[in-house]
Amino acid sequence: MLGTACRSSWNTGNLDFPKTFFFQICRLDGGFLILILSYVASPQCRTIFQVSHSVSASSAPYRLSDALNRHIPGLKSTLLLRRRKKIDGLEIHRTPARRATDALRRHLAHGFDILLPERRKDLPFSLNVLGMGFDTAQMEKADVVHLHWIGGRTVDFSQLRHIRRPLVYTLHDMFACTAGCHCTMDCSLFQDECRGNCPQLGAPRLFRNIPAWLFSRKRRAFGRIPSLTLVTPSLWLKREVERSCMFPGRKIVQIYNPVDTDLFRPAEDRNAIRAGLGIPPGAFVIACGATGLFNPVKGGHFIPLVLEELYRRGHRNLHLLLFGNQEKSVDYPFPSTSAGFITDMNKLAGLYSAADIFLNPTLQDVLSNVALESMACKTPSVTFRTGGVPEAVLDGRTGLVAPQ
């Protein structure tokens, strides 16, 4: 079905990109937190801490923090990360590291793998037991504390009750409402407190109560937080959270992720960008991500299959444009250009513009920022009808959506 969608998108000029769509989806940047503050704090909020495992220039915490600092006079947004990273223009702090507890966490994770040898290693699962500590005094300086991606031992949820400030938790995957998995795929055990045989852990009978214990521990910790508002980037994720019993009685607000349309916009001369990449004139360019190509959630294994099917059906004038670093060598039936790992967002916007379509075969995604970025550059996305992706890709208008 994805190959059919690719063939159907040959004439991308038939796709319509309504201005109202981009206003609603992409122009939220600075206004994002204003909406949140109307639920959890007074309009006088001046200081906010964004807490996350790590960030990059393309991640939601970075974009939000940057937009708030640029667009809201007098408001200061600071990033608090487990892994410190230097990013120009933003104030970044690292959560305090303690050598003894760090070693204990590593041993705990190793013991977890020993107890569960059948656990799927290709899907992330976070215990968040003995997570990184917080400087509570530092947190008291903020008017609002905004949590983002806090898996991977970033925090111990039991510590959150000590933060006496309004907490906003934006869910970027399913982790918050499960025992520890980030992508539920076809599993619905999170609707029943993760009781049963977890398909990701593959636990022997003796340890099959581990997911239920982790779920219960997390729910108790969230229940002790004095002030907590949840934000989901898609209606799909909001409905999934509501199906879980992790957050009874908590306010859940749906707000789409921001995209800077001053940055991600159609290039003035896409032919010059193509020439610089060595792409022959007149080629039909299919762009896709190469990083994590064989991650089962990203669905990258469909890309060679789609290309082989297109070749079998007689399409020859195709050129593949790959973003990111490819972990494994793959033989494609068409010429390809690898742009490598991209850190310059202006360059990324140019690559989106150079493509005729963006192939995004994700099997579960909250919203798909890459789809929003490519569409902001007026490059349609071809994707599956899964998760919150259909909320971003309007089938037949800003892209094509294939049944999964």
Where do the model's predicted regions map?
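Carbohydrate-associated surface elements
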Residues: 236, 258
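Short alpha-helical donor nucleotide-sugar binding micro-motif in glycosyltransferases
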Residues: 350-355
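Conserved donor-binding/catalytic core segment of Leloir-type glycosyltransferases
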Residues: 279-298, 304-307
